[in-house]
Amino acid sequence: PPTGWYLPEVAARRSELDSFDVVEGLVIEGGTAVEVLNAVSMHGGLIASWPDRTIFADTVVQALIEHWRSFGLPAYAQFDNDTRFQGAHQFRDTIGRVVRLCLSLGVTPVFAPPRETGFQAAVESFNARWQAKVWQRFHFDSLADVQAQSAKYALAHRQRARLRIDAAPRRRQFPSSWKLDLQAQPRGCIIYLRRTDARGRVSLLGHSFVVDRTWPHRLVRAHVDLIAEQIKFFALRRREPNWHRLLNTVAYHLPKRKFIDVRKSSNN
């Protein structure tokens, strides 16, 4: 199927999508652990990397703000289902800080289906490339050395890919007066790519929803519309990438409650 086939606006090259992922398990000689947040845009191939000792949800938020201030806002930001991106999994109706950031900037968060291949292929390929071109090519004595070499690589890569980046779908300008308010009630749309179970149901936001009993073990795209207070489920088929039939619409209301920083509260 074409690039971004599961999102019609991306597949038609009308919209850009940034994919994010974390590389874990790296250790500098001497014992310093390193994790890397990586980003790549689907059409432009615009890359960025943020090596750190540990990647927290707040690390991701600050990196996205920095990246989008510099290069503009995509229409979509795609992640896997790691709690750093999605928010805590143990509570119902949890909207994490990264999702709140995206929604506040008019960027639609997209979550890849668990245990499915292909959806994060671009950023996973970049993960491997970063390790080959940066991590495995040089000897590092400190995290600062890793960060400096990674920044050099990203800059050189963006210069080489300039024509492709310029030809990609337009990115919106970052709003000058914007300020992140984690306590604001989230508004906008969140997209979850999921596979139904044997009964045609999917689990989202701590709830189980009937999609279509005639659509078992199949891929769907769930649009959680927080303004319309509904979820629309669309059928997805790799063999028919332009076919996105609406399967079901269900009511959904996100409760209004205070955003709690789980990491900070657990450290108190």
Residue spans for each PLM region:
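Residue-level detection of beta-strand-connecting loop/turn positions
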Residues: 30-31, 81, 206, 237
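C-terminal, beta-rich DNA-binding module of retroviral/retroelements integrases
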Residues: 154-268
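Mobile genetic element proteins and their domesticated derivatives, centered on retroelements
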Residues: 21, 39, 45, 64, ...
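An active-site-proximal beta-strand-loop segment
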Residues: 16-47, 57-59
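Active-site beta-loop-alpha junctions of metal-dependent nucleic acid enzymes
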Residues: 32, 49-76, 251-254
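RNase H-like two-metal-ion nuclease catalytic core shared by retroviral integrases
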Residues: 77-80, 88-132, 143-147, 151
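Basic, flexible linker segments flanking DNA-binding modules
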Residues: 1-17, 170-175
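A short, polar/proline- and glycine-enriched secondary-structure boundary/capping micro-motif
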Residues: 58-62, 122, 241-248
